[in-house]
Amino acid sequence: LRELLCSGAIRRHQLGAKDLLTPTSYFTRGSRIGHRFMKRILTYQIEENTDIENFLRRKLGFSKKQISALKFRENGIRVNGSRRRVTEKLQQGDLLEILVEEEGKGSSQLIPAEGTVSVLYEDEDLMVVDKPAGILVHPSGGHYQDTLANQLMGYFQKRGETPVLRSIGRLDKDTSGAVLFAKTKLSAARLSKEREQGRYEKEYLALAEGYFGENSGEIHIPVGQVPGSHPIRMKPDSENGKEAHTYWKLEKQFPKAALLKLHI
């Protein structure tokens, strides 16, 4: 999973353009006193004929509200250096520039905490963090200052940054592995949409007791929550459980156990 997340395939999520060229970013004061806005120019090379609104909505995941804001923003949409309307056409080879503004209030509800943060990949839109076992991703009952999200806010506080931090998916407390975080509202919306569309895959490594006579296999057993369990635990439940599918592959066989790669 780490190799997948850190590969070039995820850096710009294959946006339907040749590449999302390195965006320029700078901070400036917003129109309201005391508020700071981050302005970024995002540049895309167009691969196929389409129109601007379709590209923004389908390829980049912009909402109606975000597209409407671009219409009235000075130089919000430029094609080959000239300002364009959202209804205009795009031709193969065009260079599309989008001026994005986001209020820099950050995830103010998160309390910054000390901790060692292992960053596997980071750019202006997202980051991939190696989560250790024994720590929650988000604050929840009884854990409001000792989660991975709290440690990340401490990490950014030291750098003088206040990102809008959103995790795309999560891992259970006792599970270690790579966790994907969005750093802006725009990237959070885009990544969440791609997750719903099934464009991300998770792979787990598990140590299982016993000898496996086959190199791969499938497990199809309904699972349900153990009543009253806290934290939540799951168990096989053929009557009330939800359908669950696990695909496993033998990575290495040991004398009394085996290392398996799991795809859920």
Where are these regions (language model features)?
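Charged/polar low-complexity intrinsically disordered segments
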Residues: 18-19, 32
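RNA pseudouridine synthases
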Residues: 25-264
